[in-house]
């Protein structure tokens, strides 16, 4: 997953740059939801991986997704994804782009996973730490429970993951011992 996020980052940044420069017909969240949904289709994947298909045919397929943006720029973006064989990362591109849009709007979505449910005091402490970390942004806090963490927290937002769990520390220790 980290590899796809690494691949996706420059494309998400390009979309965000396009969004900032365009006065109208700018890419939005819906564009980044529709494209991965289309690519998730088995027939679309077969078409996109078919070596007999030309890049122009693949771009034509993907540009069939209705979007209210500058069509020429959208097709150029799709052609870049196809030419560089980055179309499998569209879901990650969409996620990173949506995160960048929320940050530009002053909002950061954070998923906090813990081994057991956090009590009100712990939630408040984590919330304040996150607000300090993301100063100037409104932090939207979601919580999940994963007993496999044993203890501690894993904090995830966009392409940033902070693993302060017991499981993460044990895995790090195991990697160190193997080295």
From Swiss-Prot:
Record protein name field: ATP synthase subunit delta
Query: What GO molecular functions are on record for this protein?
Result: proton-transporting ATP synthase activity, rotational mechanism
Example of a GO cellular component annotation carried by this entry: plasma membrane
The record, for PANTHER family, names: ATP SYNTHASE DELTA CHAIN (PTHR11910)
The similarity comment for this entry is: Belongs to the ATPase delta chain family.
UniProt xrefs under PROSITE patterns: ATPASE_DELTA
- Source domain of life: Bacteria
| Role this protein plays | F(1)F(0) ATP synthase produces ATP from ADP in the presence of a proton or sodium gradient. F-type ATPases consist of two structural domains, F(1) containing the extramembraneous catalytic core and F(0) containing the membrane proton channel, linked together by a central stalk and a peripheral stalk. During catalysis, ATP synthesis in the catalytic domain of F(1) is coupled via a rotary mechanism of the central stalk subunits to proton translocation. This protein is part of the stalk that links CF(0) to CF(1). It either transmits conformational changes from CF(0) to CF(1) or is implicated in proton conduction.
Subunit (UniProt): F-type ATPases have 2 components, F(1) - the catalytic core - and F(0) - the membrane proton channel. F(1) has five subunits: alpha(3), beta(3), gamma(1), delta(1), epsilon(1). F(0) has three main subunits: a(1), b(2) and c(10-14). The alpha and beta chains form an alternating ring which encloses part of the gamma chain. F(1) is attached to F(0) by a central stalk formed by the gamma and epsilon chains, while a peripheral stalk is formed by the delta and b chains.
Its localization reads: Cell inner membrane
Q: Which UniProt keywords apply?
A: ATP synthesis, Cell inner membrane, Cell membrane, CF(1), Hydrogen ion transport, Ion transport, Membrane, Transport
């Amino acid at each position: 997953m980290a590899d796809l996020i690494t691949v996706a980052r420059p494309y998400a940044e390009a979309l965000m740059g396009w969004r900032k420069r365009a006065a109208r017909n700018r890419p939005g969240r819906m564009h980044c939801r529709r494209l991965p949904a289309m690519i998730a289709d088995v027939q679309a994947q077969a078409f996109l991986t078919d070596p007999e298909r030309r890049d122009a045919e693949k771009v034509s397929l993907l540009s069939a997704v209705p979007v209210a943006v500058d069509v020429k720029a959208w097709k150029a973006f799709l052609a870049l994804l196809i030419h560089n064989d980055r179309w499998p990362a569209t879901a990650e591109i969409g996620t990173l782009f949506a995160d960048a849009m929320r940050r530009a709007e002053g909002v950061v979505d954070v998923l906090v996973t813990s081994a057991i449910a956090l009590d009100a005091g712990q939630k408040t402490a984590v919330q304040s730490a996150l607000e300090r970390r993301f100063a100037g942004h409104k932090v939207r806090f979601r919580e999940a429970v994963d007993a496999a963490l044993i203890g501690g927290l894993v904090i995830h937002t966009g392409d940033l993951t902070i693993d302060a769990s017991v499981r993460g520390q044990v895995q790090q220790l195991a990697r160190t011992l193997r080295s």
